Amino acid sequence: MGAGGRMTVPNKWEGEGDEKSQKPVQRVPSAKPPFTLSEIKKAIPPHCFKRSLLKSFSYVLYDLTLVAIFYYVATTYIDALPGPLRYAAWPVYWALQGCVLTGVWVIAHECGHHAFSDYQWVDDCVGLVLHSALLVPYFSWKYSHRRHHSNTGSLERDEVFVPKPKSKMPWFSKYLNNPPGRVMTLIVTLTLGWPLYLALNVSGWPYDRFACHFDPYGPIYTDRERLQIYISDVGIMAATYTLYKIAAARGLAWLVCVYGVPLLIVNAFLVTITYLQHTHPALPHYDSSEWDWLRGALATADRDYGILNKVFHNITDTHVAHHLFSTMPHYHAMEATKAIKPILGDYYQFDGTPVYKAMWREARECLYVEPDDGANSKGVFWYKKNL
């Protein structure tokens, strides 16, 4: 059938060259949906849109308490362990602390959406402190991320993870389109992807001049936003200076073990979560002839991270609802998701594939986008893999 309907196309989901592993991809419909945003909103209980300052702070307190407990246990007991146990204990600490700090990151992200409380100044103060502590320029990313939400799924205006057409793929892509190349690409993306995006706009929208999240006069920002970009930079400088003083007092190796490696895990999770939310063989992208806000917002996928769904405050498995109503607090998002599923029908995309398998599959299957053949397919682009 045409690109407007829910379409089944052949795709290898597991393994390469294994015919038994072939399963069909059920594409999300790309035609204009038979429902409106207001109809979706009416299906959600009204209390889901209410923000509680006390409840939001309770999540901050809970996460920071866990951070403090893990820090205390690590710095008090790990070095006292025998050698082999010590080397085994540090990775456990890194994993636990990295996961909890990712939850802290998500709360700061929620502040940027004004989903933390009814008071914008409270949201901005909390978000600035939490994100700065994780070396994220709060206001800078808040504004670029807002543009992503305003233009999701648009090949011409989306802010990040914008897929390229085949004609614009770099020359070296074909040399990386193999298992060793994918492993190398994933390692670089997970370790360096987030800081490179902030500093050099890597994987971001290609502006006509150099773009950087730390530059108040860069093309990402308007004149009205520049003062707050300075504030973000001050927050980063304050956090960096604090880390410098800690390293001077305790040693760089101590700082890397206690803070640096968990932060690396936070950054890796951030890239993984964002990539898998917007990259899937079933999801369409649109050019200006077809794009509209609702279809773009629906071109996202919910994923299953197991117990980490709760640790990450359900940003992983309620992302569709988040894109539709970004000021909704996370503690109501599960209820809202259940309420909107019957309305969305085939327009709702959930994939329960284990995360490590999904990352590998998407790295293999989702290399570039092109429209399908046929007049009815113009303006709607789908992921392809044959370079």
Curated annotation (Swiss-Prot):
Keywords per UniProt: Fatty acid biosynthesis, Fatty acid metabolism, Lipid biosynthesis, Lipid metabolism, Membrane, Oxidoreductase, Transmembrane, Transmembrane helix
GO BP: any one term: unsaturated fatty acid biosynthetic process
This protein's pathway: Lipid metabolism; polyunsaturated fatty acid biosynthesis
The EC number(s) this enzyme carries: 1.14.19.-
Coiled coil: none
Motif (Histidine box-3): 319-323
Motif residue range(s): Histidine box-1: 109-113
Main localization, broad class: membrane
Basic and acidic residues: bias regions: 13-22
Record's bilayer topology term: Multi-pass membrane protein
UniProt-annotated stretches for the region Disordered: 1-31
Location of this chain's protein in the cell: Membrane
Annotated domain remarks: The histidine box domains may contain the active site and/or be involved in metal ion binding.
Protein name: Delta(12)-acyl-lipid-desaturase
Protein's organism: Punica granatum
Gene behind this protein: FAD12
